[in-house]
Amino acid sequence: MQEVDEREECGMYFIPHLGVYRSDKKTSKLRVVLNASSATTNGYSLNSLQYNGGVAQNDLFLIMVRFRKHIFAFIADVQKMYRMIWINPDQRKLQRILWRENMDEPIKTFELSTVTYGTTSAPFLATRTLKQLALDEAGNFPLGSSVVMSDVYIDDVLTGAETLLEAKELKNKLINIFAKGGMVLHKWCGNNTELIEVSENYDFSDSSEIKVLGVYWNPKHDCFSFRVKIDLHELNTKRDVLSTIARIYDPLGLLGAVVAKAKIFLQKLWMLKIDWTDLLPDTINREWRQFVESLQVVNDININRCIVVEQPEVIELHGFSDASQSAYGAVVYCKSITSDGRMLVHLIASKSRVAPTKQTTIPRLELCAAVLLAKLVHRVKQALKLNVTNTFLWSDSMIVLSWIRKESYKLKPLWLTGLLQSREMTSSEQWRYVATEDNPADFVSRGMDSLKLKTCELWWNGPKFLMSNQYPQ
């Protein structure tokens, strides 16, 4: 920032600011927070007049799924990214602040010269700048440019490679490409000690857990975990229920069965027309307390980050769908096989939706689940960018499977839209029947307690037949 004259000019804006202290932060415990939404005397604020610019990066789901395919994985952070990007000098008068170093000095006027936190356009300006940097340097650093375009979320880099040598090379390419934009990568951390030098390791011990886009990652054991803060009350309101559910941050749906149960419970409260501040009825309150008590087990669950074996010869995706009167959902697994026959099957992601409050038939809901699965598998393929050998889609509804295999002109208009959506992303040959007891999507259609989920092999690794070469026909 730079000091400017205090004289008034047309079209300027002063951004209010205050300090916020966060004791849980490893660095920058005291941060300045700017409020560009504060209205002036004419009723407008800077944020009310700005466009947000849209999205210039891949969404979080794609980046997190892709992060799970790397044998050697590492993360980094763009140091002070916003402060590395200049604002047009003609527009800096819209980013003025009042400041003084201590209480004895007079208040001075400054203009912020760079992209500023708290403004509506800041995320787009920063991420679009990174995209432009990647485009400009694509000729010099094609590998680094590709990663900047696909594996960066805001200022967080999550990427990796299949071999240690490739990972080291990628790391150096990223350092060089960001240096071209005057930026520095720091807070390095990886799942291999040879990949990240001790001096770069941001003081993390081997056993430390690092927060990666809201999910905790233990690089030593290379696994994800969750930290859900639980407040157990004797009596609860609908507001308490929603507050607790909102704390379960699970972008990939790894806890999808637990989240589905929470969604179903919340819909039940809406059906009872309970106000936000009303206490829950005794039976409902007891049910909720049991759920919250079991929810603490979530913090003990560890999930492998990497979902593929080293040097896979065959990679298969297996998706499952199911529905009940309460909800419907889809689950996707990755099966990888080496040339010597070693197999690995891991849960990739899940999605669930509560059923409409209007009475709907089970076949109709099963169709919704199949469409949801088709979309989820399409997104997973888009994220992984792997050479998938085969894709298998499983449903325990013979009715839906018969609809999928029928010619379009033979279908009722009521089902046609969903089936056409499914056919855009899948082929009828990929769909197969699975017995209900072997269908892990049953858990996202009905929900499950955390205690049962922790040890549920069917959820984490899919049905046992995936570990063989013989599948149900």
Listing of model-derived features with the role each one plays in the protein:
Residues 1-55, 162, 187, 194-217, ...:
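Conserved beta-strand/loop block within the catalytic cores
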Residues 2-128, 225-268:
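Catalytic-core region of right-hand nucleic acid polymerases
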Residues 4-7, 71, 75, 159-223, ...:
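Polymerase palm active-site segment centered on the conserved acidic dipeptide of motif C
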Residues 39-49, 84-86, 90, 146-181, ...:
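Catalytic palm subdomain of template-directed nucleic-acid polymerases
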Residues 44, 61-68, 111, 148, ...:
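C-terminal reverse transcriptase regions that engage the nucleic-acid substrate
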Residues 55, 107-131, 336-368, 406:
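A short, polar/acidic, helix/strand-boundary loop motif
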Residues 123-169, 173, 375-393:
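Active-site palm subdomain of RNA-directed nucleic acid polymerases
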Residues 151, 372-440:
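RNase H catalytic domain
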